[in-house]
Amino acid sequence: MAFSSCLKFYPFSISQAVTLTHHSFSLNLTPPSSTISFASPHSAALSSTDVKLLDSLRSQPDDSAALRLFNLASKKPNFSPEPALYEEILLRLGRSGSFDDMKKILEDMKSSRCEMGTSTFLILIESYAQFELQDEILSVVDWMIDEFGLKPDTHFYNRMLNLLVDGNSLKLVEISHAKMSVWGIKPDVSTFNVLIKALCRAHQLRPAILMLEDMPSYGLVPDEKTFTTVMQGYIEEGDLDGALRIREQMVEFGCSWSNVSVNVIVHGFCKEGRVEDALNFIQEMSNQDGFFPDQYTFNTLVNGLCKAGHVKHAIEIMDVMLQEGYDPDVYTYNSVISGLCKLGEVKEAVEVLDQMITRDCSPNTVTYNTLISTLCKENQVEEATELARVLTSKGILPDVCTFNSLIQGLCLTRNHRVAMELFEEMRSKGCEPDEFTYNMLIDSLCSKGKLDEALNMLKQMELSGCARSVITYNTLIDGFCKANKTREAEEIFDEMEVHGVSRNSVTYNTLIDGLCKSRRVEDAAQLMDQMIMEGQKPDKYTYNSLLTHFCRGGDIKKAADIVQAMTSNGCEPDIVTYGTLISGLCKAGRVEVASKLLRSIQMKGINLTPHAYNPVIQGLFRKRKTTEAINLFREMLEQNEAPPDAVSYRIVFRGLCNGGGPIREAVDFLVELLEKGFVPEFSSLYMLAEGLLTLSMEETLVKLVNMVMQKARFSEEEVSMVKGLLKIRKFQDALATLGGVLDSRQPRRTYRSR
């Protein structure tokens, strides 16, 4: 018979959802047990012989021993065991996945004419499900029907469906539903509930609602589980309003509410950060239906408050929890620790860990991983390592997340040697590195210029069976390009296609930028053409790389053509684009054009940055247009979005010291520069000092030198040395000493465009 008339118009089809990630709707906070257990349906009294054999089977150390004992007993004359004995050995074999032996036992039961029912076959299909072999389940049912003459009943069918849904075998659920009428199964409320759960997991809420609404036509009334499943489906889809509408239907049906139903709605509110609404809902249900929060309710509230950043309120809920006789569990503490870590309050998070242990609540891997990851991000790698040792001492084995956090922390603090040692330790302990592990180490090696070692790490990655990703290749290409080894970078680029790894815009942009910096601009242009042919659209990073090359080479015409092409292809130039073009114009001595472009950008409503201002200010100083340069700098000061940076101040100071204005103006500007927290370039400071000495303004020079030493945080010994030389009027020696210390304070840096 047809399962549901509504399915003529809304067929039960979840084929599009077969590959969906499993989303558990279970309210359990603890993971399900890995062992399965079944209660024997055969409760008839066993003979004393069978009781002894049953006890012996249960006492065997392993499943093989149990099977040997059973086979030995079966060879005795007149061996005719009760079904309970067969089911016991089936259970033992099922736990170890001995499916062939299980089938042989079932055939023995048939040949010995032992009483058999569908419940016996449930043991076999549940064992398959335990080992994630759901594909075998339907063939077992066909075997049961064809070879044993047993037809599945509603209970068997519901249990089978549930196993398929829980194993995310949604396509098999669809097939099973199609066979329902063939098997002559009459659905009950549980059947509908399981099928509705399958539809919700497949994100097909509309058919799930239609199925719920069609239940009365079968003389069935939706129960609490029916409504709760649909509400959970809506919440998983991020549609709390839809869940609340189902709640109203539930009330109209007169369906009673349990803590499970209430907790689903509480979870929905908290998931959306609406913790206050969750509390109001709890109050409403308490007044109407006598609801009282349970462990799950409290945990949901604590988690919701922590995710919203209200950790103090979460701790208050924990206090209420204790008052009501509920001990916070590992889930509660993990929520609070995670919330504190997100707020950067690591010390407080560690205190909560100590409190957790004091209250006999054992931390788990999640607890430690949260703290270790946060400590590493805060550059407290030693503390994180110590915590990992504590974790191990408590018998909790570090997992891949633990190792990855520590390795990442070590790489970020440039402690690559220890990171590699930890990587080797990770493998020796049987914890397989993942893609993230390898990518971090490859990135660290590339940043240190150890490119051969990075390639060796790539080989190790392949040998371990870990899939290379586009991130892996992009990291290597970037490393080789920065080392000016573009030929090798191109080889890695070509290798991606061989290994079936798709290139993305970052891949192309990285190599194009590397080629441009190596002055292989024609190759870069060809690569951009290839990028377009492969369906990748050039973006601002692509164009900016080419633009930078032409601007540095003084080819303003080609630079302008790049900007024109960029606009024509629907890629709007940004401030980096314009800033680069302005810099190129200024280097070519076309400061007036650059100034006009600056104003044009301003008119477009684009916020100007020092990247755009600085080249024009520098160009104006070079043309001895000091007043215009200073006015432009002052204009920058008024821009709250992007005030002058250290480079801006140094350009102006250099311009003033280089004869660009009265010496008093240069002195005043140096004071302003120091007050902003910047330290001047020594070359500019030296020019100013020479000017002051020429004008016999030694006292002013001494004051300025003292201010510079204070801002640059000279040691007492360094200050004493410079002051001593100034006191005996050895100004050149004092300036030389000052310059030497400043150079050590401000080592020359190489800036790489990103």
Curated annotation (Swiss-Prot):
Encoding gene per record: MEE40
Keywords tagged on the record: Chloroplast, Plastid, Repeat, Transit peptide
Cellular localisation: Plastid, Chloroplast
Pfam family, one: PPR_2
Family to which this protein belongs: Belongs to the PPR family. P subfamily.
Source species of the chain: Arabidopsis thaliana
Protein name: Pentatricopeptide repeat-containing protein At3g53700, chloroplastic
Any one Gene Ontology molecular-function term assigned to this protein's record: mRNA binding
Function recorded in the entry: May be involved in female gametophyte development.
Entry-linked InterPro entries: Mito_RNA-Proc/Resp, Pentatricopeptide_rpt, TPR-like_helical_dom_sf
PROSITE patterns: PPR
GO biological process: embryo development ending in seed dormancy
Keyword Plastid carried by entry: yes
Ranges occupied by PPR repeats: 82-116, 117-152, 153-187, 188-222, 223-257, 258-288, 294-328, 329-363, 364-398, 399-433, 434-468, 469-503, 504-538, 539-573, 574-608, 609-643, 645-680
Tree of life domain: Eukaryota
Transmembrane helix keyword on record: no
Transit peptide: 1-72
Regions annotated as coiled coil: none
Any single GO CC term annotated in Swiss-Prot or TrEMBL for this entry: chloroplast
